[in-house]
Design a protein with these regions (language model features):
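Predominantly extracellular/secreted Zn2+-dependent metalloproteases
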Residues: 1-31
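Active-site scaffold of zinc-dependent metalloenzymes
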Residues: 26-74, 84-99
Length: 99
């Protein structure tokens, strides 16, 4: 949770439609919904595992009800896993529409 709170990517563009996020961030316009943090080494020199961080409030605010929240979480997680594996989201879940 500390990572999610401390590291929410923020962009305040003049034109929200022109925001370009890196591939490890799933976003809705200028609002980040999730971020893939790759494996690496922490400050003590210990190896770390890759993590998917979901930004709860931005995701919750985009869902009208529980069913929509479930669908959005599924879509975001599929996108993040696909990014981690270096494949298209349709490889992870062929039922997703490619937008």
């Amino acid at each position: 949770l500390d990572v999610a709170v401390d590291e929410i990517p923020r962009i305040a563009p003049k034109d929200p439609e022109s925001v370009q996020w890196p591939p490890e961030v799933v976003a809705d316009g200028p609002i980040a919904l999730a971020r893939l943090i790759p494996a690496g080494v922490d400050v003590r020199g210990n190896s770390t595992r890759a993590r998917i961080v979901l930004f709860r409030k931005p995701i919750e605010r985009r869902a009208k009800d529980t069913e929509e929240l479930t669908d959005l979480l599924h879509e975001v997680l599929v996108a993040q896993v696909a990014t981690y594996l270096g494949v298209e989201p349709s490889v992870i879940d062929p039922t997703l529409d490619d937008d």
